[in-house]
């Protein structure tokens, strides 16, 4: 095979790869936000329902960080709030409301880092307990909410 022939073959494969890459990227662009909305909605509905029914593994952690309201009242109300967030994310006209409620709720999820560091860290600042990992994963939810919120006018 000559050098020119090899270059032509490589260029042809590169063009085919670029076409395939463009098609895949277009599908990812089309589906990423709807799938993200559903995924985050499922998380909020599921985790919220667990709080409402008193079977959330995070219920005790939430109860330990609430000093103003009776935890027996607050945890189920928080669960309802989370279910509402999830439902809002599933129903397009309510996405803005869901994002708003989410951003009101999320700062509270980081309170144990300040109020209960012994529960969050095995060794500060890197060694996280399971509870700490549960809290830090909320950074992903914040990023997802920003992505969803950034496209709300496009839908």
Predicted regions and their residues:
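Membrane-interface extramembranous regions
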Residues: 2-155
């Amino acid at each position: 095979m000559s050098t020119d022939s090899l270059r032509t073959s490589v260029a042809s494969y590169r063009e085919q790869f670029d076409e395939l890459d463009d098609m895949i990227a277009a599908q990812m662009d089309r589906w990423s936000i709807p799938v993200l909305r559903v995924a985050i909605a499922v998380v909020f509905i599921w985790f919220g329902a667990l709080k409402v029914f008193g079977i959330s593994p995070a219920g005790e952690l939430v109860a330990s960080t609430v000093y103003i309201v009776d935890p027996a009242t607050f945890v189920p109300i928080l669960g309802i709030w989370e279910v509402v967030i999830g439902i809002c994310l599933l129903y397009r006209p309510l996405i803005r409301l869901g994002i708003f409620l989410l951003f009101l709720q999320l700062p509270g999820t980081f309170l144990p880092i300040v109020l209960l560091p012994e529960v969050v860290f095995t060794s500060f600042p890197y060694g996280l307990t399971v509870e700490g990992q549960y809290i830090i994963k909320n950074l992903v939810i914040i990023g997802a909410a920003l992505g969803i919120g950034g496209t709300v006018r496009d839908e």
